[in-house]
Amino acid sequence: MDFLHRSGVLIIHHLQEDYRTYYGFLNFMSNVGDPRNIFSIYFPLWFQLNQNVGTKMIWVAVIGDWFNLIFKWILFGHRPYWWIQETEIYPNHSSPCLEQFPTTCETGPGSPSGHAMGSSCVWYVMVTAALSYTISRMEESSVTLHRLTWSFLWSVFWLIQISVCISRVFIATHFPHQVILGVIGGMLVAEAFEHTPGVHMASLSVYLKTNVFLFLFALGFYLLLRLFGIDLLWSVPIAKKWCANPDWIHIDSTPFAGLVRNLGVLFGLGFAINSEMFLRSCQGENGTKPSFRLLCALTSLTTMQLYRFIKIPTHAEPLFYLLSFCKSASIPLMVVALIPYCVHMLMRPGDKKTK
């Protein structure tokens, strides 16, 4: 591993030295890969375009991030910004100097990359959905058009994934091999759901049972390793020790914060998609109207951006996790049930007048 780490440090140092002027773009691409954008941007948009794809997106994102957490606990991956300070392989303090940024100091283990894994699994779902839609509307003779569409969409996919990976390496929060593992892992999870039909038709009990299983397995795995004297939160004090600015340390980057956020979203989706409001609006007479879907998409996207202003207190971890779960659960409830139902009720008076 020292060889991978040392080679990775040289790559990071090269990127920071020669491509410092591209920091704005790389920081933007790092934000593009942020798993939280799945729930605040991609999901609200895609659910209104295609409910099945939007539902699958949540399942893929949640299960993918859960696997990411388990693998991080197993692989014990270091992050460059603290490894360079802890290692003793450089003689006479001759280690390269790695610059840190406001988004560098994540506190969980580094392998595989959560940003790379989340980005690849969700964009894989979007690309395959777009291909399925376009192919179904092409004539059988349009082989050239099909190949061009296929090439274009997958080129966009890889361009985004490579940019996200480079951005995470540039800010010294991941080694190159960690982002590669993340991309591969995300694609495998997304491909597995391509062969899992009926996810969009799951009952409330399936959502609840899945939530309970994911939570108990993660908690049980954590407690089991604690019995063997293995502290799975080993990375948190190291991150706090070597982060250049204490203000850059955020509790929402800890392993359990991501788990609670994902379980909240899946819990909320289960209730929303099996609610009476969803059945009356999205599954009702207005559900297929372009105007209804457009209004729902715009309102959902606007509302999700307002969510960013809701700050959860971090002084007490149990309270933070509880409020984070509730905030996350409210996202699909708003996007899937409440907003479509309100739009449906607003459109009803106009429909009645035309009859």
UniProtKB/Swiss-Prot annotation:
Modification after translation (UniProt): N-glycosylated; the non-glycosylated form is more unstable and is degraded through the proteasome.
Record keywords, A-Z: Endoplasmic reticulum, Gluconeogenesis, Glycoprotein, Hydrolase, Membrane, Transmembrane, Transmembrane helix
CDD domains per UniProt: PAP2_glucose_6_phosphatase
Reactions catalysed, as given in the entry: D-glucose 6-phosphate + H2O = D-glucose + phosphate
Enzyme class at the top of the EC tree: hydrolase
Annotated metabolic or biological route of this protein: Carbohydrate biosynthesis; gluconeogenesis
Knockout mutant characteristics: Mice are no overt anatomical or behavioral phenotype but display a mild metabolic phenotype. Upon fasting those mice exhibit a significant decrease in blood glucose and triacylglycerol compared to wild-type mice.
UniProt EC number: 3.1.3.9
Protein's name according to its UniProt entry: Glucose-6-phosphatase 2
Natural source organism: Mus musculus (Mouse)
Phylogenetic placement of the source organism: Eukaryota, Metazoa, Chordata, Craniata, Vertebrata
Underlying gene: G6pc2
